Amino acid sequence: ITEDEPSRVIESLDSFIPENRNQPYDMEKIILDIVDDGEHYPIQSNYATNIITSFARINGNTTGIVANQPMELAGVLDIKASEKAARFVRFCDAFNISILTLVDVPGFLPGVEQEHGGIIRSGAKLLYAYSEATVPRVCVVIRKAYGGAYIVMDSIGLGADKLFAWPSGEIAVMGAEGAVDIINRRELAEAEDRNSYKEKLVKEYNKKFSNPDIAAQLGLIDNI
C-alpha cells in the first residue's frame, strides 16, 4: 500500500530536462519520481544499459516500464537494447502487466556491425512485441522521438492506448541539424557564411518543428 497520491505534483520534473537538446540526463531519476514510494525493480540492469526495463507500482498497480536512457549511447536503440525491450514487453503481456513507455530516442545505432548483426530484425521484434500486446499501454515522449526508432517505441501507430508528450518533446524524422542539411543544402552551399546561416536555420527549424504541437494537431498524441 502506498501513500503517494497518483495526482501529486512533482515540481522537480518541470526543470529536469536540460535546455541543451544534446545534453544527457538520467532517465532513472524520472522513473523514481513518478512511481510509488520512489522504488522500482530493474530487470537486466547491467545489459544493454541504453534502455531501462523495470517493474514498479503506480497508484498501487504493478507496471512494466520501458525507457530510453540518454546517459548511455544517448539512448539510441541497438540490437541488444531492442531485443531486451522486446522480451520485456512480451513478458508483461503474458502476465497481464500494464506497460509505461518513456521515450527519448534519437534513432537506431548506425554502423556496419549493427547492419550485419540484423538491427532491422531486432527492431522488428520490438515493433511486433508492442503491436501484439493486449495489456493497457501508455507512452510518454520526454524529449527526442526520431524516425523509425520512435515508431517501435510504442507510438500511436502500434496501438498505444494513450500517448502524451512533455513540452520538450520532439517528434520528427530526424534532428534539426540533419534536417537543415538536407532541406537547405543548396542555400547552405551558396551562403557566404555557411556556419552562421546554418545556425540561423537550425534555430528557425527548432522553433517551428521541435515541439509536440504539430503532432497534437494531427492527432498523433493525446495531450501535452
Describe every region a protein language model picked out.
Residues 1-224:
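Ligand-binding clefts of soluble mixed alpha/beta catalytic domains
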